[in-house]
């Protein structure tokens, strides 16, 4: 089965697992998914991530979700740029999520990073998603 938007699939898996209180989420792995999960870990939205090698040269990404007082730390997780309509922003047009309380994840020429890191480096790019 082919996926038209693997990033949206990962975000929906995380959102659904957090909504029902699961501890971990498993998804097919790719470099961009691992980079997005690493940004979420660095920003404190998830506890840990692991990449497991499977047969047939495939790998699986396992994300350990984070909860605070029984509620998921990730309250909002929304895909912004999608396969049918890519959303690119310059360094001065990068969106702030909830006036800086959340983050937006940006794919830049220097890698995948948060909006704050992209502003600090003075680069723009494709706005992948919002997290709050």
UniProtKB/Swiss-Prot annotation:
It holds the Pfam family Ribosomal_S8. GO terms for molecular function: rRNA binding; structural constituent of ribosome. The keyword Transmembrane helix does not apply. SUPFAM superfamilies: Ribosomal protein S8 (SSF56047). InterPro entries: Ribosomal_uS8, Ribosomal_uS8_CS, Ribosomal_uS8_sf. Keywords: Ribonucleoprotein, Ribosomal protein, RNA-binding, rRNA-binding. The keyword Ribonucleoprotein applies. One of its GO terms (cellular component) is ribosome. PROSITE patterns: RIBOSOMAL_S8 (PS00053). It comes from the Bacteria. GO terms for biological process: translation. Part of the 30S ribosomal subunit. Contacts proteins S5 and S12. Belongs to the universal ribosomal protein uS8 family. One of the primary rRNA binding proteins, it binds directly to 16S rRNA central domain where it helps coordinate assembly of the platform of the 30S subunit. This is Small ribosomal subunit protein uS8.
């Amino acid at each position: 089965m082919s996926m038209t938007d693997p990033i949206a699939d990962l975000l929906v898996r995380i959102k659904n697992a957090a909504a029902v209180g699961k501890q971990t989420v498993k998804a097919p792995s790719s470099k961009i998914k691992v980079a997005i999960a690493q940004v979420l870990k660095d920003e404190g939205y998830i506890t840990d991530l692991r990449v497991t090698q499977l047969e047939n040269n495939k790998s699986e990404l396992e994300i350990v979700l984070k909860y605070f007082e029984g509620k998921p730390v990730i309250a909002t997780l929304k895909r912004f740029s999608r396969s049918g309509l890519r959303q690119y922003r310059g360094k001065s047009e990068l969106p702030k999520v909830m006036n800086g309380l959340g983050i937006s994840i940006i794919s830049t020429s220097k890698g995948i990073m948060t909006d704050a890191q992209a502003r600090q480096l003075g680069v723009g790019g494709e706005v992948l998603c919002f997290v709050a």
